[in-house]
Amino acid sequence: MREESWEDHDTIQLTAQRKYLAEVQALETLLTRELSVFLTEPGSKKTNIINRITGKTYALPSTELLRLYEHLEQCRKQGALMYFLERQGTYSGLMLDYDLKLNTNAAPPLEPPALSRLCHRIFVHIKNSSVLPEGSHKIHFFFTLKPEVVQGKYGFHVLIPGLKLAASTKKSIIGSLQHDATVQKILHEQGVANPESCLDPHSASVPSLLYGSSKLNHKPYQLKTGFELVFDSSDPDYIPIHQIKNIESYNLVSELSLTNEQGSLVRPVYCAADIAAEKEEEIPTEDHSLSILMLHDPEARYLHKILNLLPPEYYVEYPLWSNVVFALANTSANYRPLAEWFSQKCPEKWNTGGKEKLEQLWNDASRHTEKKITKRSIMYWAHKHAPQQYKEIVEQGYFSILAEYVYSYNGILEHYMIAKVIYAMMGNKFVVDVDSNGKYVWFEFVLPGQPMNQGEIWKWRKEVNPDELHIYISENFSRVMDRITEHIKYHLSQPHETNILNYYKKLLKAFERSKSKIFNDSFKKGVIRQAEFLFRQRSFIQTLDTNPHLLGVGNGVLSIETIPAKLINHFHEYPIHQYTHICYVPFNPENPWTKLLLNALQDIIPELDARLWIMFYLSTAIFRGLKEALMLLWLGGGCNGKTFLMRLVAMVLGDHYASKLNISLLTSYRETAEKPNSAFMRLKGRGYGYFEETNKSEVLNTSRLKEMVNPGDVTARELNQKQESFQMTATMVAASNYNFIIDTTDHGTWRRLRHYRSKVKFCHNPDPNNSYEKKEDPRFIHEYIMDPNCQNAFFSILVYFWEKLQKEYNGQIKKVFCPTIESETEAYRKSQDTLHRFITERIVESPSAETVYNLSEVVTAYAEWYNANINVKRHIALELSQELENSVLEKYLQWSPNKTRILKGCRILHKFETLQPGESYIGVSTTGTLLNTPICEPKNKWWEWSPNPSAPPEKEASAPTP
């Protein structure tokens, strides 16, 4: 059998002693029922007793103090653990705290002769620093020693409880003792390596432990001996001293108290002092708040040990230190004492504004959601730097939590107790939240080495049932229980009294019955049900995948927030659930698959500016935030590669980030508000959506079109689900073999559309004289599009163009110069929008024109033009006026003084009339466009060219070949 560490014994024994020690039970009854009326607020100057176990403070009168001392003495004699302090008041006894560094690992002898000499030297300084009262007085000295040497460190206390001194007098005595050569010689003879600096200067006023009490996770000091010194003012040179006999017959808690005035052995001796100069010490609430936290919070004890594993750079270097502070603050607001303790590990920084910086960071943590790191990161850092020590601490933490339940409930374990330990074991790996249907849903953070689907690594995987927890309870949890059995059997092997041994026998018997339950299916299901409440993280589902700059990829998480993109293939705290199976690899134009795809893009889109614009546009599909309000309409008669390209984008991004959309979403009337629309819900959270395979002459629903393209919130719902609000974030492409019909003159709709017409056709036997006919390669459709190497390469191309768009155009598609698409879009609009055709053909911008047209004149001119060139029809003037106000003429329309709309700075042309100097057509000119002539390629690497109207690409001697 092995004995657990003292720290484990400390926390477990506190629980156990309440069961088998009647004295401890009586003490708790006294504190909770009778002395509770004397409770004080933390920090109160009335306080004289502090209970470190509960953090409660008391102002006890002398009679109640004696009762408390009696109970504490009985508990001490039974070996109970206690954590009581007394506050040194205005006048109280003297305590000297010696912290020794030894030359060896052996405890110093500290025999009575040496201690007697030390008493004499201390009394000399007392006489010199205070005014002793007249008459004969007995002054008692007690020496309490640290139980053992720890790594060459030792200590002892000198208690002089009867001599009542002011704090300033104590400080004076301590100050002079620090420089006493005789005292230093005595200590040096005892093997002390630091005799000149071993006396703690702060012992004059800090709260002092009552005898038998200790600091958390430390053994109490033990009484070595006591001396009685007699001083008579009539004969000050004769100072006899002798060792106290039968010292254990007294109530030592009472006799060694610095504030007690009613001892049987020790009587108070008051020394005169300047009372006006005295200032009562403050009760150091912060000094013991960490101890209280660790007593009551097992996780805090656990984190304290984990933080101790972090190397110095984590509390010296600001970025790492701030991460630790954020992690503690985001884990629990109660962990401020841990943050302060950790920060004080670097005294230089703490003493130069460290406390103020901590205060600021702690307050910022709740506001800065972008830095939402928690204790999970602390665990990762500790495991990274000290894996073996981390493993030992983690295992010990599980043991302590389980042991507390075993000892508190006499060996009987129920579902919640097991769930609590499982939460400590797996709380960093599993999360539970409630979905929109009110059901508890499990999520598991997937790590390397466990079974998974491609792409799940380093992400939160949704679990129907946490099967790993079921297995873990039976196979791993049993090992923790075996340690409890070992711990109980160890105590049974010790020479305890009969009542204590009987307690451990009953405990072991009950615990063995509980152990077998972890192999029972129904019991484990009960544990899992209770675990749902512990693992619950509210709104966790709502936080998943909310960062638009993060994409789950096959080999981790890709961050596109910075340039270049960063692959996160290690532990992180980003709540990512969705993913694509594609692995991210940096763009490499020399990669054979990348070369193949770059050449294919060159064939599919022969115009360089259009090719670059379309790739920039498609690259925005990897970003799921708000985008520019655009939609690409791609016209092609078939066998031109547009479908291959659109499907490849969708396959690369996967179903979580991309979706093929039903064309009826664009062509049908909008459903009523109360009806579901699953097709529309396919756009929720997607970065990419595409339409294809339309019938001839499909008419687009312009109101739906604007809703889908405009950035902002929309509402819809799935079948049998509640209405949801979400943002439109998809990059959308609509492909067709026929032109869409867009029956609107609204400029707000048209300015959101871009149109491109395919020129190339892939044929079995291409005409060698036709540069727009290319040799078809069925492998692109049947093999390459499914090949992971091809998909990985294309994903790297998308990321490359995304980075290029951010660096060179500030992420704005509209800044990319593309005369081909601009002119084709203009031509397409003219074919659909007769009002726009009229404006661009008959109205010119003329800054020097003096003529001002009433809007009614423009309406008349359009009606005449329409009847002459399109078809004879009856026009409604009011409708035409509204259409003109929403057209491209909007910026030229002004209000006249009589509140009518006028057209200014323009001129309406008559038939066959030409432009005058300084005039220009409104809209994009299609004269001499590149509709039928491909731009020649720049030499070598087309993807490196940046479209710029003032810097045309360097041209090759001839048009590109397939």
Curated annotation (Swiss-Prot):
One MF term in the entry's GO annotations: ATP binding
Domain SF3 helicase, which positions? 607-775
One Pfam short name: AEP_C962R
The region annotated as signal peptide is none
Any idea which positions bind ATP? G636, G637, G638, C639, N640, G641, K642, T643
Q: Which GO terms describe its biological process?
A: DNA replication
Swiss-Prot/TrEMBL induction comment: Expressed in the late phase of the viral replicative cycle.
Please, which domain of life does this record's source organism belong to? Viruses
Q: Which UniProt keywords apply?
A: ATP-binding, DNA replication, Helicase, Hydrolase, Late protein, Nucleotide-binding
Q: Does the keyword Iron-sulfur apply?
A: no
InterPro entries in the cross-refs: AEP_C962R (IPR056443), Helicase_SF3_DNA-vir (IPR014015), P-loop_NTPase (IPR027417), Phage/plasmid_primase_P4_C (IPR014818), PriCT_2 (IPR014819), Viral_Helicase-Primase_Cplx (IPR051620)
Quote the EC number.
Answer: 3.6.4.-
User: According to its UniProt record, which protein family does this protein belong to?
Assistant: Belongs to the asfivirus helicase C962R family.
Q: Name the chain's protein.
A: Putative primase C962R
Q: Which organism is it from?
A: African swine fever virus (isolate Tick/South Africa/Pretoriuskop Pr4/1996) (ASFV)
